[in-house]
From Swiss-Prot:
Organism for this UniProt entry: Peromyscus polionotus
Assembly, per entry: Core subunit of respiratory chain NADH dehydrogenase (Complex I) which is composed of 45 different subunits. Interacts with TMEM186. Interacts with TMEM242.
Protein's recorded name: NADH-ubiquinone oxidoreductase chain 3
Taxonomic lineage: Eukaryota, Metazoa, Chordata, Craniata, Vertebrata
A GO MF label: NADH dehydrogenase (ubiquinone) activity
InterPro entries: NADH_UbQ/plastoQ_OxRdtase_su3 (IPR000440), NDAH_ubi_oxred_su3_sf (IPR038430)
Protein family according to the UniProt entry: Belongs to the complex I subunit 3 family.
A family per Pfam: Oxidored_q4
Length: 115
């Protein structure tokens, strides 16, 4: 199987799945589906209250800096490679960029809870 055949099969299957995904959903809109659900009980208050943007920003910041672990996980296996200088410089650049991002976030008071 050559590359063109594999590409055509993948594109065809992807398009078929996208078309099926748009055709299958039922368009029955029930009001119960839009209501909030709290462990089987009626909500005590309004579930549509706005939340603090600080929580959202801290969550996004956590996700961005949590990628550091995912990117540095292969580091012990990469040490066994022949190109250790390239691997160490790449890891150093990655950690430096993340440290600069943390310093910028700190200086912009993105980690402060009080306003």
């Amino acid at each position: 199987m050559n590359m063109l055949t594999a590409l055509l099969v993948n594109i065809t299957l992807s398009m078929l799945l996208i078309i099926i995904a748009f055709w299958l959903p039922q368009l029955n809109l029930y009001t119960e589906k839009a209501n909030p659900y709290e462990c089987g009980f009626d909500p005590m208050g309004s579930a549509r209250l706005p939340f603090s943007m600080k929580f959202f920003l801290v969550a996004i910041t956590f996700l961005l800096f949590d990628l550091e672990i995912a990117l540095l996980l292969p580091l012990p296996w990469a040490i066994q490679m022949y190109y250790i200088n390239i691997m160490m410089s790449t890891a150093f650049i990655l950690v430096s960029v993340l440290a600069l991002g943390l310093a910028y976030e700190w200086l912009q008071k993105g980690l402060e809870w009080t306003e």
